[in-house]
Swiss-Prot record:
It is found in: Cytoplasm. Keywords: Chaperone, Cytoplasm, GTP-binding, Nickel insertion, Nucleotide-binding. One of its GO terms (cellular component) is cytoplasm. GO terms for biological process: urea catabolic process. InterPro entries: CobW/HypB/UreG_nucleotide-bd, P-loop_NTPase, UreG. It comes from the Bacteria. The keyword Cytoplasm applies. This is Urease accessory protein UreG. It comes from Frankia alni (strain DSM 45986 / CECT 9034 / ACN14a). Homodimer. UreD, UreF and UreG form a complex that acts as a GTP-hydrolysis-dependent molecular chaperone, activating the urease apoprotein by helping to assemble the nickel containing metallocenter of UreC. The UreE protein probably delivers the nickel. HAMAP family: UreG.
Amino acid sequence: MPLGRAPRIGVGGPVGSGKTALVAALCRSLAPSLRLGVVTNDIYTTEDADFLRRAGVLDPQRIRAVETGCCPHTAIRDDITANLDTVEDLEADTGPLDLVLVESGGDNLTATFSYGLIDRQIFVVDVAGGDKVPRKGGPGVTLSDLLVINKTDLAPLVGADLGVMARDAAAARGPRPVLFTSLTADPTAGDVTAWVRAQLADLSPHGPRGATPAAAG
């Protein structure tokens, strides 16, 4: 990671998988000890940024929006200029920051971030799509640094077998981690928060400001 800037973690996944809700949960959990910024992506609106501002998860000045005007994956992978400019302006206006979360617009299972934009990426799917989703693969499922299988509380309602999803995700991802979440059961997204803290400790030789060894482990 280049010196002089905050670590950046991308959050991607299909429409409705719970990306914005996860970003909100991470902000609530991390903001007491870390200085955060968020950049959201939507095609023609600022809907996700507006949601986060209304939820009061951060100072509104530290939440910025990119209107991509094109397929979401283009702005996070193929031409990252708008996102890079927005992240850099965010840091210049409100920094120093400990972490910037970059949320992609909703896309399909092929969407991934350019590592010219972010340092780590989380890919979010949800059980409402059925237990076949991890088996379908795609770069988002197979190559992301963390796969989050969200909305596990809905599994009984849609007939999704979490054991099958765990097996297929492990087969698709090898050693890369997979976490199952329900923001209804755990609004803090505790396991994902712990993973983020571990990445910050790994990316920064001194760890983020406010992090303790226990929290960053």
